[in-house]
Swiss-Prot record:
Residues 7-296 form a coiled coil. PROSITE patterns: GRIP. It is found in: Golgi apparatus lumen. One of its GO terms (molecular function) is small GTPase binding. Residues 315-366 form the GRIP domain. This is GRIP domain-containing protein C119.12. One of its GO terms (biological process) is endoplasmic reticulum to Golgi vesicle-mediated transport. SUPFAM superfamilies: Tropomyosin (SSF57997). One of its GO terms (cellular component) is Golgi lumen.
């Protein structure tokens, strides 16, 4: 490309030189015509001028002619110089033109080679464009695959998080089931112990009933033997006997009902334990103790034991442990309103303070017209398991949910 530009520049210079040469030739021809015209005019003036003025004018004309001739000679000299320069330029330009023509031929050959190379390059470019289109399609396909993989990765991460959450929930449920199992085991032991005590009491009541029956029989014998002499005391003895029999019958019925309730509770507990044994494989390696509830249970059980010991003591029936009542009231006020332990603590307070039916109805522990015995606190074994029952009820509600 640079050689082509150099050749074009040389051609333009040659054309400019030829134009200058043509212009100089035209100027020479014009000057010769002017001199010829002026010479003819002078000749005519020489023939017609007859006076001095004519000579004067002729002198002036001659002077002007001389000036023009000098100018012509000067121009002719310049023309000769220019012709010499033109000859030199022509010789120089001939060599340059010959050289330029050779260079032009070489450049044309070079241009042909370059055009051929350009065609090859265009063909290669076309192939490259086709390959680029193919690669672009492959890149788009790979980009789509990457997008799909990222979406799958995000879905897998979300699923992993969900599985982790479910695993934590199952672990928490397993811990609760294990704790419920331990609570049921403790409660079962308490129920068995209470059942043994109630059985022993039942036997004692049967012995007492038998003793009362024996006394009744003895009283009947004594009544028969002393009927004649103690007729006036017959009515009183009969009433005393009937009252004693009613008391014994009432106590026997109450204890029988308590025995049946304990038996039903024991059966229900055994069913729960059988159900817990089915879930034991899920909670085998997932155990965690709730220290706070255990601590509260220990403290409250100590106070319950102390309170029940005081209740058993007939001579100190009117004495109240202020520390126990204070702790119970603090626990009642600090627990949430929805916590069932509040109701159990209120029951314990009512038992310790020996509230009447009106007070129980005012605090919501007893419905109007219902019996006090329905809300009474059992003896030591069931009282000790009070908060264990509460913990079990909470865990069972969580398991059912």
């Amino acid at each position: 490309m640079a050689e082509n530009a150099g050749n074009e520049t040389k051609l333009v210079e040659n054309e400019n030189l030829q134009e200058d040469l043509s212009r100089l030739n035209l100027e020479d021809e014009k000057n010769e015509l002017k001199l010829n015209e002026k010479g003819g005019v002078l000749k005519e003036n020489d023939e017609h001028l007859e006076c001095s003025e004519s000579f004067k004018k002729l002198a002036e004309k001659e002077e002007a002619y001389q000036t023009l001739k000098n100018s012509y000679n000067s121009l002719k000299q310049q023309h000769s110089n220019l012709l010499g320069k033109v000859s030199g330029i022509k010789s120089t330009l001939g060599e340059r033109l010959k050289k330029d023509s050779q260079e032009l031929a070489q450049n044309r050959k070079r241009i042909q080679e370059l055009e051929k190379s350009l065609g090859d390059a265009e063909e290669a470019l076309k192939l490259s464009n086709e390959e680029t289109v193919t690669l672009t399609a492959q890149v788009e396909s790979l980009t789509q695959d990457i997008t799909d993989l990222r979406q799958q990765n995000a879905s897998l991460v979300e699923e992993n998080q969900l599985l982790s959450t479910q695993s934590k929930q199952w672990e928490r449920r397993a811990r609760d089931e294990h704790e419920m199992q331990e609570s049921l085991a403790v409660r079962l032991a308490d129920c068995e112990e209470q059942l043994a005590r109630e059985t022993e009491r039942q036997e004692q009541y049967e012995v007492e009933i038998q003793r009362h029956l024996t006394n009744q029989h003895q009283l009947e014998i004594e009544l028969e033997s002393t009927k004649a002499s103690h007729t006036e005391n017959l009515g009183e003895l009969t009433r005393n006997w009937q009252k004693a029999m009613d008391d014994v019958t009432e106590k026997f019925a109450s204890k029988s009902k308590e025995y049946e309730d304990l038996q039903n509770e024991l059966d229900a507990t055994q069913k729960r334990l059988s159900r817990v044994s089915d879930l034991e494989h899920e909670v085998k390696e997932k155990t965690l103790l709730i220290g706070k509830l255990q601590h509260e249970a220990v403290v409250l059980n100590e106070h319950l034991t102390k309170a029940l010991c005081m209740l058993k003591d007939g001579n100190n029936a009117e004495k109240i442990d202020k520390q126990l009542i204070s702790n119970l009231f603090v626990s009642f006020l600090t627990l949430p309103r929805a916590d069932t332990k509040r109701f159990e603590i209120l029951q314990l307070i009512s038992s310790v303070l020996d509230w009447n039916d009106t007070q129980r109805e005012q605090t919501g522990l007893q419905r109007p017209g219902s019996s006090v015995n329905n809300w009474s606190i059992p003896h030591s074994a069931s009282s000790n398991s009070l908060f264990s029952d509460h913990s079990f009820s909470k865990r069972r509600s969580f398991h059912d949910s």
